[in-house]
């Protein structure tokens, strides 16, 4: 399964403007990553899972349902997160990027993840 997951996150960095991607469990453990620095991947994985979980709690609390995806915009880029079969797909982009295209590719990746992960 890990080889398939690695290929899925690698395919995402082919999108223009995407500089990194990783797949993490809701516990923050990294399943697959394209980040060169393993420590950075572990830190980003843990933080992404925590942020995703807190936003999910907030959306449920205010009555709009479970979190599906989130975009965090920063000065020099964005972090996109999407739930994929009990995992969280995280993509890091440059500032100037076609977010619609990135989200479309993330949805495709999510479908591939769902097919690869047993129910």
Task: Identify the residue ranges that each predicted region occupies.
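Non-catalytic interaction/Regulatory regions outside core domains
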Residues: 1-119
């Amino acid at each position: 399964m890990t080889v398939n997951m690695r290929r899925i996150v690698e395919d995402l960095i082919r999108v223009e403007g995407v500089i990194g991607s990783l797949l993490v469990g809701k516990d923050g453990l990294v399943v697959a990553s394209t980040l060169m620095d393993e420590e950075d991947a572990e830190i980003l994985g843990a933080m992404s899972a925590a942020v995703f979980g807190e936003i999910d709690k907030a959306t449920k609390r205010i009555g709009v349902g479970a979190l599906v995806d989130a975009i965090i915009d920063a000065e020099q880029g964005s972090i996109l997160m999407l739930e994929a079969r009990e995992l969280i797909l995280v993509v890091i982009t440059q500032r100037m990027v076609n977010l619609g295209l990135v989200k479309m590719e993330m949805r495709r990746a999510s479908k591939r993840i769902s097919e690869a992960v047993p129910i």
